[in-house]
């Protein structure tokens, strides 16, 4: 059993960000947690990196890693991996969403 936390992983929207606005306690908390050598801070979000920075401000620099765009972009330290969807898969999803009358938001994922 772990005697102390080894990491903080949080979603943003609907968890600590509501209506596009982060709880004012979030950035100071992330900085404090990241300042400890025994804790890694990671954000998992559907947002692109620029959207993450919009709500976290300069606190984004204290993150050890991030999972952005629902897993299509992974960052850990200075390493980055991208898992783009094929265009034909995107078209299938978009077509199905429109046929079902579902709202749809697509992000190209550039930083």
Predicted features along the sequence, with ranges:
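Asp-based phosphoryl-transfer active-site loop
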Residues: 2-22, 43
């Amino acid at each position: 059993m772990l005697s102390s936390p080894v990491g903080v992983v949080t979603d943003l929207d609907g968890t600590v960000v509501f209506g596009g606005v982060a709880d004012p306690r979030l950035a100071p908390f992330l900085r404090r947690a990241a300042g400890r050598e025994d804790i890694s801070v990671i954000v998992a979000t559907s947002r692109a990196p620029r959207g993450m920075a919009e709500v976290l401000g300069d606190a984004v620099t204290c993150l050890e890693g991030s999972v952005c765009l629902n897993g299509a972009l992974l960052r850990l330290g200075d390493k980055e991996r991208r898992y783009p969807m094929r265009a034909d898969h995107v078209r299938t999803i978009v077509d199905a969403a429109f046929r079902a009358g579902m709202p749809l938001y697509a992000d190209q994922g550039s930083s």
